[in-house]
Amino acid sequence: FFENFGFEKYSKLKDDTGEFIFRKRMKPRTSDYTILSPLEFDIKFGPRYFNDEQDAFLVPVISSYHNMLFPESIKENLLFPQLDYMDSFSNAMRKAYLCKSNSTLVREGAILFFYKSHDMGTIETCGMVERVERLQNPDEIISVTGKRTVYQREEIKTMCSGGKNILVLLFRQAESFSK
């Protein structure tokens, strides 16, 4: 688990409890910029380490889904945020975005800037693509996304009913921009 976020096993505790000490290097070496892919770099030093060579995309999200996927964006605007509004997909750094886009440009390591499409139109969150899939079978989509998506099983089935491939973007949330 910890390796998914750039931590390395450093040593085992001396009292033989089976516990390990993990460490994470916070500053990259010059060679890391050329040796590692953008995703590997983000895993090792991120979140928030981007370079000028990465592709970036603006991603529209309908307000209600945006609020579920990124609840911190609405909590900042509330005087008394509700602490019970937490689902597994909203309480994670690794999330999934589904859409019917025909785009084939998005690749692993690309930066995604999410904005509310029918609301304020402001960019509030960014992330980095971990994996890109094009799928038609709802069960495959559910298997790939797990609990990382805001969509319920029936919504995914409806989305797939048109016979069109669904673009599945698994991404790591890097930052939510404060207001």
Regions found by a protein language model. Give the residues of each.
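Contiguous surface segments at macromolecular interaction interfaces
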Residues: 1-77, 87, 134-179
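Short His-Asn-centered micro-motif
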Residues: 60, 115-116, 126
